[in-house]
């Protein structure tokens, strides 16, 4: 079976991708599957990184039985009679994607939406989690820095990976601001992880309210 990793077509373009080059190589080595990757200038991994793992690049996805992406696929890019995996944002009857769902039906496409994939206990397999919290905390502080002009911070998407972001945080000097982080679930824990990476001290609620600090807490 051939699986195609499609180029993200939604505007603005998304840099995310379903499988890393190493994951593609591992899947092909252990399963009766061939993976084709559609070239992309916007993907977080360069095309050459897939080629180095002997993963085939191809602009033609017609030969693939299954096509996998992240965001909604533009209607004009939908190939009839295929199985697609992506976040369609149609499950809650979102009006803005009604035409997309109609096109999927008209083209005899089987859509498998990540949003409704669950385990035997009915729990979602793909949902907001650690990485959503990490990106949210980072970009929240990026926004604060932009609005106040008190510090500079690159967007999370401009970092190659988490390790690069961690190294970058050591160069950033945050002003003495107070940050309230609510929630202790997967997203909250991801946000707390980034704040810790940034060197932002965690303090007790009473001290947070009553003490003055010369650094971010």
Residue ranges and their predicted role:
Residues 43-44, 120-121, 211:
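Short secondary-structure capping/turn micro-motifs that flank functional sites
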Residues 16, 20, 43, 93-97, ...:
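Generic structural signal for well-ordered, non-membrane alpha-helical segments
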Residues 49-50, 72, 126-127, 133, ...:
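Charge-rich, low-complexity amphipathic helices
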Residues 2-103, 107:
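An N-terminal-biased, well-structured beta-alpha scaffold segment characteristic
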Residues 7-40, 152-217:
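Glycine-rich phosphate/diphosphate-binding loop of Rossmann-like nucleotide-binding domains
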Residues 2, 74-177:
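Glycine/serine-rich phosphate-binding loop and adjoining beta1-alpha1 elements at the start
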């Amino acid at each position: 079976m051939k699986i195609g990793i499609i180029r993200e077509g939604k505007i603005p373009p998304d840099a995310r991708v379903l499988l890393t080059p190493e994951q593609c190589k591992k899947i092909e080595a252990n399963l009766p599957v061939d993976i084709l990757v559609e070239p992309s200038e916007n993907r977080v991994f360069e095309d050459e990184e897939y080629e180095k793992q002997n993963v085939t690049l191809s602009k033609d996805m017609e030969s693939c039985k299954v096509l996998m992406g992240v965001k909604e696929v533009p209607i004009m890019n939908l190939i009839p009679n295929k199985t697609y995996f992506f976040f369609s944002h149609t499950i809650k009857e979102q009006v803005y994607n009604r035409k997309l769902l109609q096109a999927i039906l008209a083209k005899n496409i089987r859509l498998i939406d990540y949003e409704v994939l669950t385990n035997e206990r009915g729990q979602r397999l793909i949902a907001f989690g650690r990485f959503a919290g990490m990106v949210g905390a980072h970009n929240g502080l990026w926004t604060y820095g932009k609005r106040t002009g008190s510090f500079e911070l690159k967007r999370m998407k401009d970092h190659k990976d988490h390790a690069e972001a961690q190294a970058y945080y050591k160069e950033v000097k945050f002003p003495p601001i107070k940050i309230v982080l609510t929630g202790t679930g997967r997203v909250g824990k991801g946000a707390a992880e980034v704040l810790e990476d940034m060197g932002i001290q965690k303090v007790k609620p009473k001290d947070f309210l009553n003490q003055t600090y010369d650094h971010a807490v």
